[in-house]
Design a protein with these regions (language model features):
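Short, conserved aromatic-histidine micro-motifs
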Residues: 109-111, 145-158, 216-219, 223-224
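Intrinsically disordered, low-complexity polar/charged tails and linkers
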Residues: 1-11, 22
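N-terminal charge/polar-biased segments
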Residues: 1-3, 201-227
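Flexible, glycine/charged-enriched surface loops at secondary-structure junctions
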Residues: 39-45, 112-116, 184-198, 217-225
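Small-residue-enriched alpha-helical segments and adjacent helix-cap loops
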Residues: 13-141
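A glycine-rich phosphate-binding loop feature that marks nucleotide/adenosyl-phosphate handling sites
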Residues: 120-125, 194-202
């Protein structure tokens, strides 16, 4: 449900656009669907394009015409993985788009205790507001910095640094470790930052780093067995 005005309901739909990168054909398709059904287009803060003002009877038809997946599958899930231009920017320190797309594929629609946002950026300038997200992955010359618990909602919170100077693989598995720990230990409805505050950052960081070391050791053993 998008809007109720004078007793009439209109709806909005938001197709999946990984990292905010979209092909010209898909962008034209979204515009054509909005035009066909009299909708308005809105560039969202989550790096997607929403079609707003649709009539109830047109929602399903609009999705069929788009032929795209929805941007959000559940209210309590990983909402999106935002990315900066990175490889198209002179300031980028790593190929963070490659890592970001890998994270997006892994966590698209993944269920969480509360809505969760992840951002992957190519340098410390953090053009996609990484430090206002639940999990932030920031590239530097020496590797990736991982922070957790950021928020820009009703209770703004800066994230806590968890690890730094990780390789691409290590950064991916660190995000996975944070996600798993959050899902296993947090209360339903609890934002990641609130969870960290409840158990303390010292415990959160210690537990996550221990789990991460175990995960990496297991991965090394599996790789050795497959050689």
């Amino acid at each position: 449900l998008q809007k109720i005005r004078n007793g009439k309901k209109t709806y909005g739909i938001t197709p999946r656009i990984p990292g905010g990168f979209i092909t010209p054909d898909n962008l034209i398709k979204i515009a054509n669907v909005a035009k066909k059904y009299g909708g308005a287009l809105k560039l969202t803060s989550g790096q997607r394009v929403a079609i707003l003002g649709l009539q109830p009877e047109d929602v399903e038809k609009a999705w069929e015409d788009l032929g795209m997946e929805p941007g959000v599958l559940s209210s309590y899930s990983v909402k999106n993985v935002e990315m900066c231009p990175a490889i198209f920017c002179k300031r980028s320190k790593q190929n963070s788009v490659k890592l970001g797309m890998r994270i997006e594929r892994r966590f698209y629609g993944a269920i969480t205790p509360n809505r969760t946002k992840i951002t992957v950026v190519g340098c410390r300038n953090s053009c996609s507001s990484a430090y206002a997200k639940d999990i932030s992955v920031v590239a530097d010359q020496e590797g990736y910095i991982i922070a957790a618990g950021g928020s820009a909602g009703f209770h703004p919170r800066l994230p806590d640094k968890i690890a730094e100077y990780l390789t691409e693989d290590e950064a991916f598995y660190m995000v996975e470790t944070i996600y798993d720990y959050y899902c296993n230990e947090a209360e339903k409805g609890e934002k990641l930052g609130h969870f960290i505050d409840r158990i303390t950052i010292d415990k959160f960081r210690k537990d996550v780093l221990n789990l991460f070391e175990e995960k990496m050791e297991n991965i090394k053993k599996e790789d050795a067995q497959n050689e």
